Design a protein with these regions (language model features):
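Bacterial N-terminal signal peptides
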Residues: 2-11
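Bacterial signal peptide processing site
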Residues: 12-17
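Short solvent-exposed beta->alpha transition segments
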Residues: 18-28, 32-79
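Surface-exposed, charged secondary-structure patches
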Residues: 57-103, 231-233
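Extracytoplasmic
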Residues: 77-81, 101, 111, 132, ...
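Short beta-strand edge/turn micro-motifs at domain boundaries
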Residues: 94-134
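Juxtacatalytic substrate-recognition/specificity segment
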Residues: 139-262, 353-356
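Acidic/His/Gly-enriched intrinsically disordered linker/tail segments
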Residues: 211-218, 238-239, 257-385
Length: 385
């Protein structure tokens, strides 16, 4: 009986393992053919592997690479579910593959071939832009803008903002970064939340965020600026530019922004570059903090990371951003633009938060944290009272 089982196993999968391996190999081959169709812009070949709508949604995206790695397969007759890792690079922008988890449903066709019936984000992964519909693409001198449910004219407006932001950031920070940005413009707040894999309520009123690869681990081979079109639409022309320049600053400073960097510095520095050259006065750019100072409620300490939580009360959140901006503005006023950049880099060079700010203040600015805080409070009185 054992000999018979061994013989039949080599032919029909006695015990199930050879058959399972065969199915995995067949599905991986299917995904390889589908990936080749994407890269070769071959809609006909893609349609033999999966729904053509999925191909049409992403066909305008300029891709340098696109591949799947099957990690698990669970078959139940003519239907199977699978987990896979999708890796891709946007041509000219991503220096390494973006990798995200995908959950696939497959079915056997009448001729016994596997077919991708659905391809969705894995349980803990955010959506990709093409999961939300057909992607339109506009390329700029320093930017790539991709949107869903947006007119080409509106994407061109974002391109103009991004193309202005990149050289503005380089003028203040320097040129030791990629000097280009990818901007994603979904159709709504819900679309933004889908890309981030978070509840929409977390980003209501937030005009844009910068993240590592959308839906990925956050250890970013490339950053994405993701716009909340609902909040962005209510901004004036200066506000729209400030937001895009702020987010572009996060892209530029990514390599020097570490766990040692407090949010008052990373957000304050991004706002400082964002407002630079706009002509906005402190009372105009920091209205909530200005009201607090004028009411005698002068902050006793620099904003904490907790103060920047999206769940914070709107006024408190605004004061945190404004307080960080005023701290960076003070450094520029008293020590200069170059020293502000050196201070930012010095803080980020530390391995951990403890002592990072204090060490950088002593080495770059020549003051203690206590002295800096008192100078900042005096600066708030002078500028906002």
């Amino acid at each position: 009986m054992l000999a018979l089982c061994l013989l039949l196993g080599s032919l029909v999968g006695c015990g199930g393992q050879p058959a399972a391996n065969s199915a995995k190999a067949a599905v991986q081959s299917l995904l390889d053919r589908q990936s080749a169709a994407v890269l070769h812009h071959d809609g006909t070949a893609y349609a033999r592997t999966g729904a053509r709508t999925a191909y049409e949604n992403l066909s305008a995206v300029p891709l340098a690479s696109w591949s799947y790695r099957l990690t698990s397969l669970h078959r139940a007759g003519a239907i199977a579910t699978a987990d896979a890792q999708l890796s891709y690079r946007v041509k000219g922008y991503d220096t390494a593959p973006v990798t995200v988890g995908r959950a696939l449903t497959l079915r056997l066709t009448a001729d016994g071939q596997w077919y991708v019936a659905s391809d969705k984000p894995a349980k803990k992964s955010g959506q990709q832009l093409w999961d939300q519909g057909k992607v339109s693409v506009v390329k700029g001198a320093h930017s790539l803008v991709m949107g869903v449910g947006r007119s080409v004219d509106s994407l061109r407006d974002f391109r103009a903002l991004a193309d202005h932001a990149v050289p503005a950031v380089s003028a203040a920070w320097g040129t030791d970064w990629t000097r280009h940005v990818v901007v994603l413009v979904p159709g709504s707040l819900d679309g933004m939340a889908g890309l981030l894999g978070s509840p929409a309520a977390s980003y209501r009123g937030i005009a844009a965020v910068t993240t590592g690869e959308a839906g990925g681990s956050g250890s970013a081979p490339a950053d994405r600026i993701i716009v909340n079109p609902d909040a962005y639409a209510v901004l004036g022309s200066v506000g729209k530019q400030v937001v895009l320049t702020h987010e572009t600053t996060h892209v530029a400073t990514r390599a020097h922004t570490t766990p040692a960097t407090p949010l008052w510095l990373s957000e304050g520095y991004a706002d400082w570059i964002g407002y630079r050259g706009t002509g906005r006065t402190p009372t105009q750019a920091a209205p909530e903090l200005s009201r607090a100072v004028q009411d005698g409620d002068l902050p006793t300490a620099l904003p904490t990371d907790k103060d920047f939580g999206f769940s914070s009360e709107a006024t408190e959140l605004a004061r945190a951003y404004e307080g960080g901006w005023m701290a960076c503005r003070m450094i520029q006023d008293r020590w200069g633009v170059d020293q502000l950049g050196k201070f930012y880099r010095a803080v980020g060079s530390h391995q951990k938060r403890a002592g990072a700010v204090e060490g950088a203040m002593k080495n770059v600015l020549g003051v203690t944290l206590e002295e800096f805080t008192e100078q900042w409070r005096d600066y708030l009185r002078a500028q906002l009272a």
